[in-house]
Amino acid sequence: MYKLVLIRHGESTWNLENRFTGWVDVDLTDTGAAQARLAGKLLKEAGFAFDVAYTSVLKRAIRTLWHVQDEMDEMWIPVRNEWRLNERHYGALAGLNKAETAAKFGDEQVLVWRRSYDTPPPALEPTDPRASYDDPRYANVPREQIPLTECLKDTVARVLPLWNESIAPDIQSGKRVVIAAHGNSIRALVKYLDQISDDDIVGLNIPNGTPLVYELDASLRPLRHYYLGDQEAIAASLAAVASQGKAR
């Protein structure tokens, strides 16, 4: 049996302000850093150790991984920073307050933009300063692969090649893998692993800074999965994530 650990980054500054973030490179709050440290402590106490780590190229996920590694005394393990693990791109919604956007467009429309499988938000113009074409962290990414908006289907399309080419082979070679990423890149992986339908994925939320453990068989099919931590606190965190896109 293999184990895989997925961790959404701790609370970010724009999580706190209830803003659509996407590829904007915001940092953790003090609460987010504490969540990440607690995740590392829980993993260490549960006997986990890792051989390789994956994360995105956005600092909220990178710093979350640092805190986890620090708590586990595993700062030395190899880390792969992969743009394909970035949060989904929220297009022209980036920076907007979710509740204010819901008040303007309606809860239902914002829920579709946030959680539906195949409906992207309005795209950025290529000349928009929020576009990532000139960002040095994407210098080796073909321009046509750098998004101006994404739906979850698009996120799945960029995450799964990384899974098939790198992550899955690492796991099957016996390496113990941890992935610190984002709500929607993790939803993309969970959708694939658990074979969640396009309709049912709308209801899936991922809490900040909470280790999600998958136990996998030899073919990497899930045997079970569970969150580490206080289950009441996790339920409250999930409810908070679900309510972010509603008008106040």
Swiss-Prot record:
Family named by the database record: Belongs to the phosphoglycerate mutase family. BPG-dependent PGAM subfamily.
Gene3D superfamilies: Phosphoglycerate mutase-like
SMART domains, per the entry: PGAM
Catalytic class of the enzyme: isomerase
Species this chain originates from: Cupriavidus pinatubonensis (strain JMP 134 / LMG 1197) (Cupriavidus necator (strain JMP 134))
Keyword Isomerase: yes
EC number(s) recorded for this UniProt protein: 5.4.2.11
Active-site residues (renumbered): 9 (tele-phosphohistidine intermediate), 87 (proton donor/acceptor)
Summary of subunit composition and partner proteins: Homodimer.
Entry's Gene Ontology molecular function annotations: phosphoglycerate mutase activity
Keywords: Gluconeogenesis, Glycolysis, Isomerase
Coiled-coil regions, chain positions: none
Catalytic activity: (2R)-2-phosphoglycerate = (2R)-3-phosphoglycerate
GO biological process entries: gluconeogenesis; glycolytic process
Residues under site feature: Transition state stabilizer: 182
Positions bound to substrate: 8-15, 21-22, 60, 87-90, 98, 114-115, 183-184
Protein name: 2,3-bisphosphoglycerate-dependent phosphoglycerate mutase
Pathway, per record: Carbohydrate degradation; glycolysis; pyruvate from D-glyceraldehyde 3-phosphate: step 3/5
